[in-house]
């Protein structure tokens, strides 16, 4: 009788089973960082250790999220209280990402508003030919804003139980995302300056490249959601996996708007 009483859960939270993935992820992170340092300093075995850590992290990401999906979909462990906790976790994660980009914008405004004498005392620097904002950057802005609209369309379709429309919305979003990444790569290949061309190149490639990395991550996120939607993993009430992906994608949209308005447009037109 006592053992039966102990099995009754008297709270709405999910107590996860013991898992090896936190430890394996920590070991993968150690291999990734330590191997990266060894590789950059040309030590023997650094590249192998770096690859081992990278593929370990990828494996843990796949298996850990697989377990989370199983707990939500097949075990019914994601109650309303659990979903609220997941939402708060995603919000805090996005806030931490905002802090990353805040540092890049800080570096840009520090360098552009008060340019030092060794770059000519002007912004853009005298030896740098800046990229016009009205070419590929403007096209990429249209692509990302359109993708934000299409992912919202998919979200409303999921809430309304319209699976076919949701699939169409996600497919359009993925097409826009892939086109954005391709255009960004094309822009980099034809850029008249590189990352080593002073503070302008460093700030430009760090900010836009880090954003491009987030676009790739968001594209993978949405692609996984498309597969899960096809497999009928989402319902009108339970679709936080997609909701998190949509939040992340809107965050990517907003960051790009700030990048376009500051680094591309304002940074191209100012003469300090």
Swiss-Prot record:
PROSITE patterns found in the cross-reference section: COX3
Major subcellular site: mitochondrion
Keyword list, A-Z: Membrane, Mitochondrion, Mitochondrion inner membrane, Translocase, Transmembrane, Transmembrane helix
GO MF terms, alphabetically ordered: cytochrome-c oxidase activity
Residues making up the signal peptide according to the UniProt record: none
SUPFAM superfamilies: Cytochrome c oxidase subunit III-like
GO CC aspect terms: mitochondrial inner membrane
Chain ranges passing through the membrane: 20-40, 45-65, 89-109, 128-148, 166-186, 204-224, 248-268
BP GO terms, sorted: mitochondrial electron transport, cytochrome c to oxygen
EC numbers: 7.1.1.9
Membrane topology: Multi-pass membrane protein
Catalytic reaction annotation: 4 Fe(II)-[cytochrome c] + O2 + 8 H(+)(in) = 4 Fe(III)-[cytochrome c] + 2 H2O + 4 H(+)(out)
Localization per Swiss-Prot or TrEMBL: Mitochondrion inner membrane
Disulfide bonds listed in the record: none
Family of the protein in this entry: Belongs to the cytochrome c oxidase subunit 3 family.
PANTHER family referenced in this protein's UniProt entry, alphabetically: CYTOCHROME C OXIDASE SUBUNIT 3 (PTHR11403:SF7), CYTOCHROME C OXIDASE SUBUNIT III (PTHR11403)
Record note on quaternary structure: Component of the cytochrome c oxidase (complex IV, CIV), a multisubunit enzyme composed of a catalytic core of 3 subunits and several supernumerary subunits. The complex exists as a monomer or a dimer and forms supercomplexes (SCs) in the inner mitochondrial membrane with ubiquinol-cytochrome c oxidoreductase (cytochrome b-c1 complex, complex III, CIII).
Role noted for this protein: Component of the cytochrome c oxidase, the last enzyme in the mitochondrial electron transport chain which drives oxidative phosphorylation. The respiratory chain contains 3 multisubunit complexes succinate dehydrogenase (complex II, CII), ubiquinol-cytochrome c oxidoreductase (cytochrome b-c1 complex, complex III, CIII) and cytochrome c oxidase (complex IV, CIV), that cooperate to transfer electrons derived from NADH and succinate to molecular oxygen, creating an electrochemical gradient over the inner membrane that drives transmembrane transport and the ATP synthase.
Protein name (Swiss-Prot/TrEMBL): Cytochrome c oxidase subunit 3
Organism annotation: Pylaiella littoralis (Seaweed)
